[in-house]
Regions:
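Loop/turn-to-beta-strand initiation segments
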Residues: 90-93, 161-165, 209-215
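Phosphate-binding/switch region of NTP-binding enzymes
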Residues: 157, 189-234
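Conserved P-loop NTPase "ATPase switch" module shared by AAA+ and STAND
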Residues: 162-180
Length: 234
């Protein structure tokens, strides 16, 4: 079979698959060369040097970012500056305060518009992760409604004020319901890790399609009996 014949056969197969799939669904397939090249949208970190260091100019939109470091190294302060930048860009911001330690006075002093900041202080890991997933899903629904109205009115969609940044502070502070309701001596092996894995699988496509950046703050800890490699883990 010649190269041209193979290419034609592949095109036929792909056309059949595309015919059965909706253009807006995730199972639609098309050749990358047929799609317009899209630059990665970003939200500034609030730090010019970090924006430059990241290579794309800030936090990428529609992605999940882990911001980790040792205790008291300025992670939350960096995130507050990112919130300021997002608000100046006309984006809505949600702060999931699992540590129950958000200093509103300090945030206002830095320049955060705390009046327009959405804040939640969930008690359990399940509540926190469900909230992040629900925020992404709701934002995706709203985004599609705006796009549909703009298409009907033949105008450009206006996403000003829509949720664009979600902060989870922090992964290390998430407490599973079973641990919260259990006894001090009960063993709960890798509960948060399993929940985070499941949540990531749910949040990743929703965050991408809703164009929402999720920043998960995490603590850096020493590995126990680390024989080789980095002694740190998150």
């Amino acid at each position: 079979m010649s190269k041209a014949t193979k290419a034609a056969a592949t095109e036929t197969v792909m056309s059949r698959i595309a015919a059965r799939a909706s253009k807006d669904s995730g199972n639609n397939i098309q050749r990358l060369g047929d799609r317009p090249l899209e630059a990665v949208e970003v939200t500034s970190t609030g730090s010019l040097s970090l924006d430059a260091g990241l290579g794309v100019g800030g936090w990428p939109r529609g992605r999940i970012v882990e911001l980790y470091g040792q205790e008291a190294t300025g992670k939350t302060t960096l995130v507050l500056h990112s919130i300021i930048a997002a608000q100046k860009a006309g984006l809505g911001v949600a702060f999931i305060d699992a540590e129950h330690a958000l200093d509103t006075k300090y945030a206002r002093h830095l320049g955060v518009n705390v009046d327009d900041l959405y804040v939640a202080q969930p008690m359990t890991a399940e509540e926190a992760l469900d909230l992040v997933c629900n925020l992404c899903d709701s934002s995706l629904i709203e985004r599609r409604e705006i796009e549909a109205r703009a298409k009907d009115e033949k105008t450009a969609p206006d996403f000003t004020g829509m949720l664009g940044l979600i902060i989870l502070d922090s992964v290390a502070a998430l407490v599973p319901k079973a641990e919260l309701e259990g006894e001090m001596g009960d063993a709960h092996v890798a509960l948060v890790a399993r929940m985070m894995g499941k949540a990531m699988r749910k949040m990743t496509p929703s965050a991408h399609h809703a164009n929402v950046t999720i920043i998960c703050i995490n603590q850096q800890r020493m590995k126990i009996n680390a024989g080789h490699g980095s002694p740190w883990t998150t």
